[in-house]
Amino acid sequence: MSLRRKAKPKPVQQKVVDHTLRTCHEVEGFPVYSERTSSYLGTISDICFSLKGDCLGFILAQKRFLHHHHALLRACDISSIFDDRILASVSSEQLLPLPKSCFTYEQMKMKLVKSQEGDILGMLEDVYFCLDRGIIVAYELSDGFFSDLAGSKRQIQRADSLVEVRKDEIVLNG
């Protein structure tokens, strides 16, 4: 008669990665707090993208005595996004100045979107981004007011190529 020991199951710790897609419109106005100090860092006023289409982070509006100051909260410094607030792993002293070579959601929204061949795809309504990967995932396009009433907005998947933001239009190079 052999004695067998039963192996006890060991809990395996798994890293859960949040691949939740967010839209620019969805996070505008969210308050941001420091995870370390619980202090208020500012309010999301816009989202900053590189010229390659990567999500650099959020632009924070910080109220000062007589004016508003804007700073960049990098995407890698964001700990959690909740339904009503954002937690960051930095303090207010670690926020960065706004980069000179970037574009914002405010600059992009409601612009005409064209393909590289010059075909009109629609007007940009929103941008879907994946924060943990720091990239634009898709663009939400509209064909105009009446198609919006009918509920016919389209999502265009982002290509791995550059986006060219011009004065009156956006050209998707891909």
UniProtKB/Swiss-Prot annotation:
Protein name: Uncharacterized protein YrrD
Species for this entry: Bacillus subtilis (strain 168)
